Amino acid sequence: MSYGSIARGGGLGSRGPFGGPSRQGCQPLECARCWTEYGIRHFPCPSPESKLQNRCVGKDGEGDLGPAGTPIVPRARKRGPGVAPEGSRMPEPTSSPTIGPRKDSAAGPHGRMAGPSTTRAKKRKPNFCPQETEVLVSKVSKHHQLLFGTGLLKAEPTRRYRVWSRILQAVNALGYCRRDVVDLKHKWRDLRAVVRRKLGDLRKAAHGPSPGSGKPQALALTPVEQVVAKTFSCQALPSEGFSLEPPRATQVDPCNLQELFQEMSANVFRINSSVTSLERSLQSLGTPSDTQELRDSLHTAQQETNKTIAASASSVKQMAELLRSSCPQERLQQERPQLDRLKTQLSDAIQCYGVVQKKIAEKSRALLPMAQRGSKQSPQAPFAELADDEKVFNGSDNMWQGQEQALLPDITEEDLEAIRLREEAILQMESNLLDVNQIIKDLASMVSEQGEAVDSIEASLEAASSHAEAARQLLAGASRHQLQRHKIKCCFLSAGVTALLVIIIIIATSVRK
């Protein structure tokens, strides 16, 4: 049934004898069209003879219609079905017309949301559960030097991203919530802030609790927070059992420079020994003796060597500070050749260590494809590995899908687990890699700064010696001047005594006569 039949039958679009809207219908024809096309309900509707724009129901003029119900503003107030407009004496129909597209609850005149829930708020992710926090802390603390290292231990952004991706995969494997890398970084930052605040409170409580402070037992760190505290340089308290000692180089007294040289020589020897051990273990990779214990020993040796290199770099910095401080010139001339020799030995050892690390990483990567391919692989290459010119249509595309599905059962769960373990081992090896070039540059900059400090000390000593010579000359002149004054005083004193004696003799002789 069309709207024309409704209008002719005195229904929805019927009109009275004076051209106005009829009370037999709910709304005029134009009103039904407005509702169907624009989702607007209003009463009365302008007559077709009127060319003026009549005001319709809306807020602040919204919902105005031009001739024949044409909208002239972007939006109009939405009213649901069955709601009578204000000021109308006749109820509106509870059902909308069945002709034309319906946009009553979806969009306004221009396709925008017109209902009360126009914008849907972004759903907030749930907080980290204890299991997710434990996995995050264990993984991040394990690769902390690679993720947050600076200076000598700073890694490339791509390598850090791979490590974060691996940590994200481990956290999402728990199945509690779908996280991303940003969530992990924010959670780690919040954990560090909480631990830093607790460490400060514990330190204040150790020095002496204030009268208004709470109990120190309430500030005790949890095991997870203790692991986070170990990533700080030296913020933990000794009473908690997880205090971190600062590098030994920062605790050396300026008078014990020779002890610092001996420590650096021992570190160079340890690095060379680690290089020899790693080369021996490198030959066993890919052989029947390649076991998990061998991989663990490689990882442990590289971690210890990285710590030794960091301690050696701290020793170089400490020696530069000691040489920059007060030091006799004779001792400075004696210690400088020894420092240059140790610096050269350390640079050579670090370069050899970097070469061995690269070899280990390359060989580990080369072993991963061997584990993936194996003996179960079909001689036919899957469709995804074929070149574009080889993907010739032959019958239908289902043939290629069938070939790929035929290849998938060849890879078992054990193979996937082995691949995952090897990938973790490769990632672990890459996390142990150090930027050798950056280390050499840092050592060169340290030595150059040290040379500048030594030169400045020599210049200061020369200036001090020249000033001392000038002071000596001034003192000699002052002594000569003082001697002359003493001589003059002696002369005047002797002359006075002589004159006094003469006067006494004259007086004595005159008295006798």
From Swiss-Prot:
Residue positions, PTM Phosphoserine: 378
Pfam families found in the cross-reference section: Myb_DNA-bind_5, SNARE, Syntaxin_2
GO molecular function, one term: SNAP receptor activity
Domain of life: Eukaryota
The UniProt record lists the keyword Coiled coil: yes
Keyword Acetylation: no
GO CC annotation: endomembrane system; SNARE complex; synaptic vesicle
Cell location: Membrane
Major subcellular site: membrane
Disordered: annotated segments: 1-23, 49-128
Extent of Gly residues compositional bias: 7-19
Domain t-SNARE coiled-coil homology: residue ranges: 416-478
GO biological processes: intracellular protein transport; vesicle docking; vesicle fusion
Stated name of the protein: t-SNARE domain-containing protein 1
Organism of provenance: Homo sapiens (Human)
